[in-house]
């Protein structure tokens, strides 16, 4: 088996996690108490969904997941919610004291006390796997727990499970909508370790997803639940090929191989189509060509950056539902002829496609319409650098005056860590610039010394 362990850290990670597991359960017909009436092989078996669920002898399906937070309120909602019987109580780890939006508290003082417990639980899950493929890590880098404890866990996972791939789904601060003043600090410090310790990171951004909900689903005032359900569709599409059998299956390591041209250039944009409300879906013909086009629309991107300002290096299209390879090839050919979608000149093919025959499921009473086919795109575009340059700019404004820095130093950090992380991000911005530049100086000009 190719099992994946999901790790949900901090409030954002946990709430996205709730939406994802709710959707997985729907897709596989698993009830909130973990029973699965349709499962013929009770107590194990080699079903494809066993990559995400482990089965007990009593026929109960338990998610291979860990939820961690430094304060109890969010995890208590899981403990008392609809899916309280789905999770093993040991999988829900909560501390007593908040990270208070402070990276240093999440990484050094408070996170340090809880991290061994987390690794212990992860070790138990890993021992329960026959062929662990990797980790999916969900967190946000604006807060204290997601950024601090998230980085700490990633660093420790690299030590304990060196070769296993780590995919991050990371919520980055939005340009306009901010939830805390020190977001830029936390994000820069946290990205510093995301660079080292994740193999692929998919960037999400609340503002971009708000706009998609507002525009495509006509929700006037989207809530986090609306956002998370949209994000969970993306994550479900990515992992569908691990959980179902399909025509062109893509596993986690394939993403890495096809999307990451250089180790540091691994921050991805994602988009999903069709995002459409039930009223509209009834009147529209959502062909493969149409949904492929709308996945490339700048307004469909789930992070606030405009792919027209950069070039694509590679992209991965995951179709699900009633889709045949012939349609996909035609749709991709059309995309390639478009002038607005530019690829770097050193990556001529640039497309990786996967097809899964399981049609997309939707949460009953949710916002999305039930459709016959859908596509999720993960793309590596140089325009992602906009996300970083925005955060870096805000970081510089604050750090020039050393505003709020004493809170971090008081928790045992050194100022040197700030400048080190900031320099690392400056180097990242430069890397993206070089990758997007046309090659004039032969194959490999000044990139030889980088790696």
Curated annotation (Swiss-Prot):
- Known catalytic reactions: GTP + H2O = GDP + phosphate + H(+)
Q: Where in the cell is it found?
A: Cytoplasm, Cytoskeleton
User: What keywords tag this UniProt record?
Assistant: Acetylation, Cytoplasm, Cytoskeleton, GTP-binding, Hydrolase, Magnesium, Metal-binding, Microtubule, Nucleotide-binding
Which residues of the sequence carry a binding annotation for Mg(2+)? 71
Top EC category: hydrolase
Protein's UniProt keywords contain Nuclease: no
Q: Where is this site: Involved in polymerization?
A: 451
Instruction: Indicate the residues that form the catalytic site.
Output: 254
SUPFAM superfamilies tied to this protein: Tubulin C-terminal domain-like, Tubulin nucleotide-binding domain-like
- State where it is primarily located: cytoplasm
Give the matching PROSITE patterns: TUBULIN (PS00227)
> Example GO molecular function term?
hydrolase activity
Q: What does this protein do?
A: Tubulin is the major constituent of microtubules, a cylinder consisting of laterally associated linear protofilaments composed of alpha- and beta-tubulin heterodimers. Microtubules grow by the addition of GTP-tubulin dimers to the microtubule end, where a stabilizing cap forms. Below the cap, tubulin dimers are in GDP-bound state, owing to GTPase activity of alpha-tubulin.
Official protein name in the record: Tubulin alpha-3 chain
Q: What species is given as this protein's source?
A: Hordeum vulgare (Barley)
Q: What is the lineage of its organism?
A: Eukaryota, Viridiplantae, Streptophyta, Embryophyta, Tracheophyta
Question: Encoded by which gene?
Answer: TUBA3
